[in-house]
Design a protein with these regions (language model features):
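Short acidic (Asp/Glu) and glycine-rich catalytic loops that position anionic groups and cofactors
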Residues: 1-4, 115, 204-209, 224-234, ...
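Glycine-/proline-rich flexible loop or hinge segments
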Residues: 1-11, 34-36
């Protein structure tokens, strides 16, 4: 249940903790409680998205989201996800040559299919998202605009990325990525009425019912306490300083990788992540003349991920536009929040780029590079 409406006694302090988490979540994004409500009970992002869908759609309704190969998430309508099985999914993408969102295509698809929900947000997109355009497109076809900001919530809270709230009906975020909180999710919903004719419920009320009792039983109160702490930290001056360094580190890493001959999706980054394009043209011969790998020697995302992990560098394989297999894609995703938390700055990012070059292109000894990484990171202990 929810504060004041639990099914069990002895919840006074849990109620106070949950209300505190809600208050801090709204404060982190400068939201008015008169206009917005927030549910802090979702166990993680995937069930949070499904709760939103079940609250606002019927089975077979049209859901529109970013395709997996363009940088979208499974729960945005991929056929392997229940979101693509319960609902008719329409997938939008990016310009193949630039990797940038194709807002003209999004507008045309919305006009053609009239989706019930249009999702903005991505799992692997290194550029800023124009939430205003998404909001305008959704409004033009009578759709709900759901912004999934799971990967960029910390940047938004710090004012380093445009906010989705002025142009969204619902905003969902996980709390364990750039927010640096526990593994969980929160759903922000407008207090305005549902678009369904004759409905007396607000969007927020419908979503609350979908989370509990629709999707979940008892809340994880220990996690909600951690969410309250995460949002408390997100309102402090040091959090903005940290997020600025996250972006600065990502840009430094991107520029250094390009100097070593790597091609990046979209040519760089505006946020905390970047994606290396590992397709056959990923070496810029004019930059690195010594790199003469043949097509047969090119590595896919899975191979690159495993090689780098063996050397002590954790990355994530990532699909690129046109990829058929999410298991062996053509891209490699890198993020800077964790390293930045340890105190790493631009100088170290240049060294990390060099190690990636030596692992993937020069094929140097992985054990040797691992020793070098360990020596550097001894200067940046986790605790």
């Amino acid at each position: 249940g929810y504060p004041g409406k639990r099914y069990y006694p002895g919840n006074f302090y849990y109620d106070e903790i949950e209300k505190l988490a809600q208050k801090r979540a709204l404060k982190a994004f400068n939201l008015s409680p008169e206009k917005w409500s927030v549910n802090v009970q979702p166990y993680s992002g995937s069930p949070a998205n499904l709760a939103i869908y079940s609250a606002l759609m019927k089975r077979g309704d049209i859901l529109m989201g970013m395709s997996l190969s363009s940088g979208g998430h499974l729960t945005h309508g991929h056929k392997a996800s229940i979101s693509g099985q319960l609902y008719k999914a329409v997938q939008y993408g990016v310009y193949p040559k630039t990797g940038l969102l194709d807002y003209d295509e999004i507008r045309k698809l919305a006009k053609k299919y009239k989706p019930r929900i249009i999702i903005s947000g991505a799992s692997a997109y290194p550029r800023k998202i124009d939430f205003k355009k998404f909001g305008e497109i959704a409004k033009s076809v009578g759709a709900y605009h759901l912004a999934d900001i799971s990967h960029i919530a910390g940047l938004i809270a710090a004012g380093l990325h445009p906010s989705p709230f002025p142009n969204s009906d619902i905003v969902m975020t996980t709390t364990h990525k750039t927010l640096r909180g526990p593994r969980a999710a929160v759903i922000f919903s407008r207090n305005s009425k549902l678009k369904t004719q004759n409905s007396k419920l607000s969007i927020a009320e419908a979503i609350d019912r979908a989370v509990f009792p629709g999707m979940q039983g008892g809340p994880h109160n220990n996690v909600i306490a951690a969410i309250a702490l995460a949002f408390f930290e997100a309102t402090k001056p040091g959090f903005k300083k940290y997020q600025k360094q996250v972006v600065a580190n990502a840009k430094a890493l991107a520029e250094s990788l390009k100097k070593f001959g790597f091609k990046l999706l979209t040519g760089g980054t505006d946020n905390h992540l970047l994606i290396i394009d590992l397709r056959s043209q990923y070496i810029d011969a004019s930059t690195i003349s010594a790199s003469t790998l043949s097509i047969a020697e090119r590595v896919d995302g899975l191979m690159a991920e495993k090689k780098l992990e063996a050397a002590g560098i954790l990355t994530s394989r990532s699909a690129l536009p046109g990829d058929k297999s999410p298991y062996k894609p053509s891209g490699l995703r890198l993020g800077t929040p964790a390293a930045t938390t340890q105190g790493v700055e631009e100088k170290e990012m240049k060294k990390i780029a060099e190690w990636i070059y030596r692992v993937l292109l020069k094929k140097e000894s992985l054990s040797l590079i691992k020793k070098e990484i360990k020596a550097l990171y001894e200067k940046f202990p986790i605790c």
